[in-house]
Amino acid sequence: MGSRPFTKNPAPMMLTIRVALVLSCICPANSIDGRPFAAAGIVVTGDKAVNIYTSSQTGSIIVKLLPNLPKDKEACAKAPLDAYNRTLTTLLTPLGDSIRRIQESVTTSGGGRQGRLIGAIIGGVALGVATAAQITAAAALIQAKQNAANILRLKESIAATNEAVHEVTDGLSQLAVAVGKMQQFVNDQFNKTAQELDCIKIAQQVGVELNLYLTELTTVFGPQITSPALNKLTIQALYNLAGGNMDYLLTKLGIGNNQLSSLIGSGLITGNPILYDSQTQLLGIQVTLPSVGNLNNMRATYLETLSVSTTRGFASALVPKVVTQVGSVIEELDTSYCIETDLDLYCTRIVTFPMSPGIYSCLSGNTSACMYSKTEGALTTPYMTIKGSVIANCKMTTCRCVNPPGIISQNYGEAVSLIDKQSCNVLSLGGITLRLSGEFDVTYQKNISIQDSQVIITGNLDISTELGNVNNSISNALNKLEESNRKLDKVNVKLTSTSALITYIVLTIISLVFGILSLILACYLMYKQKAQQKTLLWLGNNTLDQMRATTKM
């Protein structure tokens, strides 16, 4: 991952650094515990320390390409030295010419604005076809012009020294170290040995070593044929030029051994050629080093997801790739401003994003809050190794245990299978055989199931299918609406006016009142009729009794 350009406004960056430092001082850093959600297909792959850097330090290396031999041995090595000198001049003259063209293109006439404008135009012509990065390198080369001139002023004394490492400070605005890889070889082979060597052996040894160094020079400057002065030299190239003497400059600039290996892997230590003098065979390189600030209490945690098995098919968890935790706060970390090494992140700024409550709860160990996206691709990751063990989706791939032999089955509803040496010593996954040495302890949650409500649609094809279903539902609703409109069109609008409705309501109420009164009257008449019938019946019975009594008498 490449680094982003440095910000033009330092204020936001300083504010970010201060906020990060304050946060790092308040709470101790906690690494996210991946054991609760490993069985849910979310795996913590590692942590890295987070650092802030700016490319603010510079120093110069003056590479002495032509060694000084002892006086009594100069004649023996004259032939290989002359051939080496000619080859050096042929190889590096385009580099020196390119440097001079760019540096001389900024000469001004009279020091006014017009002169600077003309110089800028000539500089653009001198660059030819250049990328933005090469234009930036050209600007740095122009800024180093005075320092290169000061080095050239001391070139005779630098070329005359027999020291392999020599610090140059006279009249220079920055630290400069003269190093000679070939001079180191001469000193080790001839100046510090009491063994007498014949002339032929001296010539052979010098010739072989010079040829090897020429090969290294060709390797270093081979990619710079098109724009020899504008391409950066990597730290590996600088070590090829200076040998072990490169460490002297780095130590002087404050790079400790504990940072050196990480910074070398980051690619932040680079160099740009600023001069080449064919007369003395001196090559000047300006080295740029980062100024690093360590955020001791901030770490970046990397997450990877597996394809898990659900009742709706295979799915992968929706979580950030990188998160950072300070205290109890977990946020997504944007690494686009960072350069990664094996153990560190070097960032020009710290940019984090808050996460939704669901993802926060998921990464805190609540797997029921994790959301998943359907994944049906053939390249979806079905398994992953972690600390000598394996987390695998044995429904997506065949988990064959070689020792002891058997097929590892995954229970219905189980998201993934956690396989360690307790269950299988040698495991075969899709033709890949792994010997397991780790073990999942009791802190790892197992037999986690993913509910249907946790699986959402995010793939383009799935979304298209769902949209098609929605469109069909909308079409059906529109058809029903049109049918309803047709029925409403048949209704007489005049009968549905407000006055008509009021009349209908009043008439309905009157009808109800009359109906109720009629019902009451009918009930009264029926009651009265029954009463009359009872009276007549009583009178009839009474008369009959009197007649019976008279007859008996």
Curated annotation (Swiss-Prot):
Disulfide bonds join C76-C199, C338-C347, C362-C370, C394-C399, C401-C424. The inactive precursor F0 is glycosylated and proteolytically cleaved into F1 and F2 to be functionally active. The cleavage is mediated by cellular proteases during the transport and maturation of the polypeptide. It comes from the Viruses. InterPro entries: Fusion_F0_Paramyxovir. GO terms for cellular component: host cell plasma membrane; membrane; viral envelope; virion membrane. The chain crosses the membrane at residues 501-521. Residues 1-31 form the signal peptide. A lipid is attached at C523 (S-palmitoyl cysteine). SUPFAM superfamilies: Head and neck region of the ectodomain of NDV fusion glycoprotein, Virus ectodomain. Belongs to the paramyxoviruses fusion glycoprotein family. Homotrimer of disulfide-linked F1-F2. This is Fusion glycoprotein F0. It comes from Newcastle disease virus (strain Chicken/United States/B1/48) (NDV). The lineage of its organism: Viruses, Riboviria, Orthornavirae, Negarnaviricota, Haploviricotina. The gene is F.
